[in-house]
């Protein structure tokens, strides 16, 4: 299974961030898969067309400290984004960042990132049922317990795994081996 939601943007230019993350990697890969003579006609069998959930605050608390999650849902969010994406250099100058060119505020990134976390949760849940699922929007695995790192504000992989792990514990009634 492949989770690819074409409505989900991958770039960050609308936030004024000039880090070259291109939508084309996902869209071109998807286009090549659907153009494949064997895979294309069977796209309905392997393509999940939309991310159906967003990560929630309680999901974030499975992988991040309460203090960090509170900072993300407060006026400190913009400072966390600036630090995580290294948008100001050691001399206090903008680095790969042009706020004048932004069409959206930096703080609007959180909603987009929460949808990506939800996509990773959905992909992991799908993989449990089908044996495999690749999600074009995931992989924010550098974020730490109490801070974002390496252009990753949240650790979607750990959040998803811990959410699914908690679901397994709840459903089975005992701790699995």
Q: What do the PLM-derived regions correspond to, one by one?
A:
Residues 1-177:
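HDAC/HDAC-like amidohydrolase catalytic core signature
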């Amino acid at each position: 299974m492949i989770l690819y939601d074409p409505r989900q943007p991958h770039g960050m230019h609308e936030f004024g961030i000039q880090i070259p993350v291109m939508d084309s990697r996902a869209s071109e890969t998807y286009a090549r898969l659907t153009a494949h003579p064997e895979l294309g006609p069977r796209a309905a069998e392997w393509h999940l067309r939309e991310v159906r959930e967003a990560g929630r605050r309680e999901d974030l608390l499975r992988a991040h400290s309460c203090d960090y999650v509170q900072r993300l849902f407060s006026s400190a969010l913009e400072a966390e984004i600036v630090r995580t994406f290294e948008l100001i250099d050691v001399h206090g100058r903008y680095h790969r960042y042009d706020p004048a060119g932004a069409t959206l505020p930096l703080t609007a990134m959180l909603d987009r990132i929460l949808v990506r976390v939800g996509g990773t949760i959905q992909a992991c849940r799908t993989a449990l049922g089908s044996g495999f699922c690749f999600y074009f929007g995931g992989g924010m695995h550098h974020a730490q317990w109490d801070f974002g790192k390496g252009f990753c504000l949240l650790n979607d992989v750990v959040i998803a795994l811990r959410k699914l792990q908690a679901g397994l514990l709840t459903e089975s009634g005992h701790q699995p081996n």
